[in-house]
UniProtKB/Swiss-Prot annotation:
Keywords: NAD, Transferase. Removes the 2'-phosphate from RNA via an intermediate in which the phosphate is ADP-ribosylated by NAD followed by a presumed transesterification to release the RNA and generate ADP-ribose 1''-2''-cyclic phosphate (APPR>P). May function as an ADP-ribosylase. PANTHER family: PUTATIVE PHOSPHOTRANSFERASE, TRNA 2'-PHOSPHOTRANSFERASE 1. The gene is kptA. This is Probable RNA 2'-phosphotransferase. GO terms for molecular function: NAD+ poly-ADP-ribosyltransferase activity; tRNA 2'-phosphotransferase activity. It comes from Methanopyrus kandleri (strain AV19 / DSM 6324 / JCM 9639 / NBRC 100938).
Length: 234
């Protein structure tokens, strides 16, 4: 993962060496290794195990403290806290503002939440905008799951919702995290709506659907997604 840089003039966080806002040369703020580790830790705390750092989440998924207090609780309570002695609230803000998928959100009180991906055991249901104009969505999975999915649909498994994307390449990247033999399922969003399933926008290219995506909403299977994505780039 790329380092996060900061503009010394306007304070904008970016991956670029020149600030898009004011044109100044940026300085490194958080190296790529720490950025990746912190992003994964935030995902874990905000989606699955907030109690491990003495944090409570409300119904919308927001923490009971601001990001600066969250940094202090991580340094005090997290089991591997010795690796996070450097952490401040500003590092959390930087990770949120530069997250390519828009996984996190900070409200006007400085509280943070994950926008999607929560475990079923947490009583969290974030309010997310309905994706009214999206027509086609993608879901990447392993080839060995295909027969079961075409028979039973795409299930949320341990999560509250099925994750989809409007970007075929993103679906491939997601699938490749779990398998060497990916396929991409193409989902008709209008058919979802006819089933009473509402696609909601949860991140920059991420959409969620509460419940199982029925098999008849899967209109196509891209069996060689690498070739498909490469041909789109040409």
């Amino acid at each position: 993962m790329k380092p996060i840089r900061v503009c010394p003039e306007c304070g904008k966080y970016t991956e670029k060496h020149t600030c898009e806002r004011c044109g100044r040369r940026t300085e490194e703020f958080l190296d790529g290794r720490r950025r990746l580790a912190l992003s994964k830790l935030l995902s874990g705390i905000l989606r699955h195990f907030p109690e491990e750092v003495k944090v409570k989440l409300d119904d919308e998924g927001f923490t009971d403290c601001d990001v600066h207090e969250l940094a202090e609780r991580i340094k005090k309570y997290w089991k591997n806290r010795e690796y996070y002695r450097w952490l401040t609230g500003e590092h959390i803000i930087a990770v949120v503002e530069t997250c390519p998928k828009g996984r996190f959100e900070i409200d006007e009180h400085g509280r943070i939440r994950a926008r999607y991906g929560h475990s079923r055991r947490l009583s969290v249901r974030p309010t997310l905008p309905e994706a009214e104009n999206v027509k086609e969505l993608y879901h990447g999975t392993a080839r060995e799951n295909l027969e079961s999915i075409l028979q039973h649909g795409i299930k949320p498994m341990g999560r509250r919702a099925v994750h989809l994307t409007d970007d075929e390449r993103e679906a491939l990247i997601t699938a490749l995290r779990h398998t060497r033999n990916p396929v991409i399922l193409v989902v008709d969003a209008e058919r979802l709506r006819r089933h009473g399933l509402v696609p909601r926008k949860a991140g920059k290219n991420v959409y969620v659907v509460e419940g199982t995506v029925p098999p008849d909403c899967i209109t196509r299977v891209i069996r060689n997604p690498r070739r498909s994505v490469e041909s789109e780039k040409r």
